[in-house]
Regions:
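Short, Lys/Arg-rich flexible segments
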Residues: 1-149
Length: 149
């Protein structure tokens, strides 16, 4: 799964102490926050596809195919929509899609068959912006609160 990683650094020693406690806690404790984060990020991607917006809230560039059929971009058959998953890895969580065309849709670039090549606009439906950062921070704060004696 290609995906998104989250890194956070804190100067506050109390928060650092609690994060260290999370790292050495029973795996079930920290796993719940990572699962919540994974489920949130997959849901965020699906909400973005449903709402035809990018991760930053801006409108998704429409494909010619979607315009011609008067439908939605990247969601006609739900293949890409259903392909986004998360998995717990080490001390984090990976979120992404294993579909080859997920990358070209995310980053944009030249694609198509020989003689029919074109430049596809980037449509990053997955990402970490201010809205996602706030939600992820809330999941971690909730986990720290659960770890309190």
């Amino acid at each position: 799964v290609s995906g998104t990683a989250l890194r956070a650094g804190f100067n506050d020693s109390a928060i650092t102490h609690h994060l260290a406690m999370l790292a050495i806690m029973d795996a079930d404790g920290f796993d719940s926050a990572r699962r919540e984060i994974g489920e949130y990020l997959v849901g965020d991607v699906q909400d973005n596809l449903d709402g035809q917006k990018l991760f930053d809230g801006s409108a998704m560039p429409q494909s010619k195919a979607a315009i011609n059929r008067k439908g939605k971009t990247l969601i006609d058959h739900h293949h890409l929509y259903d392909s986004y998953v998360y998995q717990l890895v080490g001390g984090g969580v990976e979120v992404g899609s294993a579909l080859v065309y997920a990358a070209i849709n995310h980053f944009g670039g030249e694609t198509g068959r020989t003689g029919h090549r074109f430049t596809m606009k980037a449509r990053p439906v997955m990402g970490i912006g201010p809205r996602q950062e706030a939600a992820l921070g809330n999941f971690l704060i909730a986990e720290i609160r659960r770890a309190q004696p």
